Amino acid sequence: MTDSLAIIEQIHKSFDLKDFNSLAIPAKAEFFCSIDSVSQLQQALVYAKQQNLKITPISGGSNLVLAADVSGLVLHINLKGVSASTVVDNTVDISVAAGENWHDFVTLCLNNGWHGLENLALIPGNMGAAPIQNIGAYGVELSHFLQSVDVVNVETVQPEVLTDEDCDFGYRTSVFKQSALDKYVITGVNLRLSTQPVTHVSYPALADLLQGVEPTPKIVFDTVCQLRRSKLPDPKEIPNVGSFFKNPIVSKQQADQLMATYPEIPMFPLKGDFTKLAAAWLIEHCGFKGSRHGKVGVHHKQALVLVNFEGNGEDILLLAENIKTQVAEKFAVVLEVEPRIYGHTY
């Protein structure tokens, strides 16, 4: 088993995590270590096993809520590197380390003529979090391009490769949030992109802005950035984790009942007997959009975004629970929280 002695001097005690979560919550890690290589990760996992410490991997911190101080060993996954294969049949395979910034990578792809990810521009966070929730926006999801995920098994401390089928992707979910929760630490992601200028512009908000325009990948990229900046606050300026709730999926029967009462409610038909609803609309029509609740609140331009004004994790979760309760009472729809909660059963 990998020697863990070298890692000890790199581990910090009672480490402030405020700068490592985009909600800027002032929680502390009992122990903390920044991970720059797979071998260092293996050493840290061995050390955690020897000391009987629970491990908590984080990266960009853009999809988590720290409800309290985090016990055990927090691993900041900071692996870097992007490599591309030779182009074959108008496609290119790209391997990306888990610590690479997502938007910077999308920009790199655009500049290199690797296409497909333009709709996912400006999504906050790092590469390692992308497959966990199968990030998506404006009609495109990561799973459309993912070939495999490089991981280290927490129990065996050995590297493994999970195929796209192994990842069991769904709407904002994957095996990493379900049966393999806490089983792996993601170290890299392998994608296949097109070297031909393909675009995806069927999403209504995108289609409206591009009406009468011949969309190029650059135009789609710029338009998506424009849309996101117009609706979503920059976490560096107003701490947030982006969309706090998933868009709920209901039966067609329930959707029809809602439509009869609320003819203006946005709906998106899905395969089978299901319909996706706009969580932001439900929250806004419960009166939460732009509201402030002590040191936290709901953004004035996007009701899906909860923002932090120097509050703590419990403040955020109390607001989220209030929103869930009001939406359930008014619409009989259950909202599901998108970010992962640490230090609290929710």
Q: Each predicted region: which residue ranges?
A:
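Generic structural marker for isolated residues within well-ordered, non-membrane alpha-helices
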Residues: 106, 279, 324
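A common structural junction motif
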Residues: 50-54, 324-331
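Anion-binding (especially nucleotide phosphate/pyrophosphate-binding) glycine-rich loop
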Residues: 2-156
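Short amphipathic alpha-helices in soluble, non-transmembrane regions
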Residues: 44-48, 206, 319-323
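Residue-level signal for inorganic ion chemistry
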Residues: 37, 61, 125, 157, ...
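Phosphate/pyrophosphate- and phosphate-bearing ligand-binding catalytic cores of soluble enzymes
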Residues: 13, 19-25, 159-314, 318, ...
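Generic non-transmembrane alpha-helix signal with a bias for helix starts/N-cap capping motifs
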Residues: 41, 102, 276, 320-321
